[in-house]
């Protein structure tokens, strides 16, 4: 590619999926430019690495580019897209560019409705501990690396494979992981769950004959597609028929202690430095891959025990002063689907037994809120106190029956929790200051702008003091 393409421009370079690819390309020696609507820590990092960053979208931003990379979130009438089309500059989907990176190395692609980012991070961390020095492209910031991407010197590239727009079908890795299959982004599949499952089957068909599909057999939908996978399968999970499984699981001090059982290997005692059964499953995927690639048991144990997590995935901000003179534990999480939320709430209950759980939740997308409305009501009813915001639209038109206010009224009718509804995320710090008490565990959750709230909470309390 490099003998033809010298300069690559990214429309929306500050996004999690785009920025990682851009960083790897910068480190490969390409001239990289990009635009976004606002600056953030990611754009600042890319600029420091040598990328040219423009704030705002303008046709002039693509000057000199040999290719323009877009995600499915970029509209076709974006001025940079229109300019590229007018000038005959190739417009490349993000997943296609990721596929090009995978051609340079052996790809390990992590797919599934939930858990992709954490699992990708665990795989990258375990392989790095084993001396394989992988390249990785992750949808969140790996805290230990301080970045969501890194160019390694080893043979492997570890990356997320996105099913939300079916773009994972552009990838041709040598190892695939399927964590689970759930009903999300159903517009892509015509609201036909069978089509979604078929897409995952087609994803496994991208594997070479020597590749392997590493699949979580605890998920019933994954289990259903296994008979249709024609490539070698490695089963992981808590189920008795898993080839890599966890036994004797014990949650203590915010960590998961368990024994790994692998066919033909001695039992392996593991301590995972994060809570939740779902993260035990994610770790098992990493252990399965690491074992297959010859990583030592000592390296596996070390990597999992020292794993510092991923930004916005049960990210702990420590103790924050509460308005009553005490303090509460603050956690931030990206969860935005009821299944993810239930797993995070269960992890918090396990990590902090007996403590009151306060959730500040921003729903993400009106269509998801509509499609999962009853499930949202059920999962939100399991917390002890709730601050609920209006839906983060993510470019969608409002649906009055699937608004944050409608969700709040439905929760109040069920009667298990009395939500405090606020119209905007800017109102969350003040609402939490009135709700949170000494000894509480407070979780801010959602895939939208609520990710900026934790830093504001500390500032809010300091201003009130």
UniProtKB/Swiss-Prot annotation:
Enzyme's top EC category: ligase
UniProt lineage: Bacteria, Pseudomonadati, Pseudomonadota, Betaproteobacteria, Burkholderiales
EC number: 6.3.2.8
Entry binding sites for ATP: 112-118
HAMAP family: MurC
GO CC annotations on file: cytoplasm
Disulfide bonds: none
Pathway: Cell wall biogenesis; peptidoglycan biosynthesis
InterPro entries: Mur-like_cat_sf (IPR036565), Mur_ligase_C (IPR004101), Mur_ligase_C_dom_sf (IPR036615), Mur_ligase_cen (IPR013221), Mur_ligase_N (IPR000713), MurCDEF_pg_biosynth (IPR050061), UDP-N-AcMur_Ala_ligase_MurC (IPR005758)
Keywords from the UniProt entry: ATP-binding, Cell cycle, Cell division, Cell shape, Cell wall biogenesis/degradation, Cytoplasm, Ligase, Nucleotide-binding, Peptidoglycan synthesis
Source domain of life: Bacteria
Family, per entry: Belongs to the MurCDEF family.
Entry's Gene Ontology molecular function annotations: ATP binding; UDP-N-acetylmuramate-L-alanine ligase activity
Subcellular locations according to the entry: Cytoplasm
Major localisation: cytoplasm
Reactions catalysed, as given in the entry: UDP-N-acetyl-alpha-D-muramate + L-alanine + ATP = UDP-N-acetyl-alpha-D-muramoyl-L-alanine + ADP + phosphate + H(+)
Protein name, UniProt field: UDP-N-acetylmuramate--L-alanine ligase
């Amino acid at each position: 590619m490099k003998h033809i393409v010298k300069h690559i421009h990214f429309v929306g370079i500050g996004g999690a999926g785009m920025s990682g690819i851009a960083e790897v390309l910068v480190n490969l020696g390409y001239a990289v430019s990009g635009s976004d609507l606002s600056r953030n820590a990611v754009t600042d990092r890319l600029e420091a690495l040598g990328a040219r960053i423009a704030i705002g979208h303008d046709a002039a931003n693509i000057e000199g580019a040999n290719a323009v990379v877009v995600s499915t979130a970029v509209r076709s009438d974006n001025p940079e897209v229109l300019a590229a089309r007018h000038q005959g500059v190739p417009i490349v989907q993000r997943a296609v560019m990721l596929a090009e990176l995978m051609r340079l190395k052996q790809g390990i692609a992590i797919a599934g409705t939930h858990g992709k980012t954490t699992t990708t991070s665990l795989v990258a961390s375990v392989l790095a501990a084993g001396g394989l020095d992988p390249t990785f492209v992750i949808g969140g910031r790996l805290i230990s690396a301080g970045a969501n991407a890194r160019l390694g010197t080893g043979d492997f590239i570890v990356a997320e494979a996105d099913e939300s727009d079916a773009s994972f079908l552009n990838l041709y890795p040598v190892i695939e992981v399927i964590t689970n299959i759930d009903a999300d982004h159903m517009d892509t599949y015509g609201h036909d769950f069978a089509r979604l499952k078929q897409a995952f089957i087609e994803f496994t068909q991208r594997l070479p004959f020597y590749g392997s599909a590493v699949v979580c057999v605890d998920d019933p939908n994954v289990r259903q597609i296994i008979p249709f996978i024609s490539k070698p399968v490695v089963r992981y999970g808590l189920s008795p028929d898993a080839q890599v499984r966890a036994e004797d699981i014990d949650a203590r001090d915010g960590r998961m202690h368990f024994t790994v059982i692998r066919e033909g290997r001695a039992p392996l005692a593991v301590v995972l430095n994060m809570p939740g059964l779902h993260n035990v499953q994610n770790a098992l995927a990493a252990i399965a891959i690491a074992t297959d690639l010859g990583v030592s048991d000592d390296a596996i144990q070390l990597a999992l025990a020292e794993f510092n997590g991923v930004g916005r995935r049960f990210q702990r901000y420590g103790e924050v002063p509460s308005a009553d003179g005490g303090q509460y534990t603050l956690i931030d999480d990206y969860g935005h689907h009821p299944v993810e939320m239930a797993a995070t709430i269960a992890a918090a209950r396990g990590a902090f037994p007996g403590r009151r759980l306060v959730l500040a939740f921003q729903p993400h997308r009106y269509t998801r809120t509509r499609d999962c409305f009853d499930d949202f009501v059920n999962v939100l009813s399991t917390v002890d106190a709730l601050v609920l915001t209006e839906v983060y639209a993510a470019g969608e038109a409002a649906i009055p029956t699937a608004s944050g206010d409608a969700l709040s009224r439905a929760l109040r009718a069920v009667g298990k929790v009395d939500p405090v509804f606020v119209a905007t995320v800017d109102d969350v710090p003040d609402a939490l200051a009135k709700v949170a008490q000494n000894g509480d565990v407070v979780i801010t959750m959602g895939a939208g702008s609520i990710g900026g709230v934790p830093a504001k909470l500390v500032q809010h309390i300091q201003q009130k003091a």
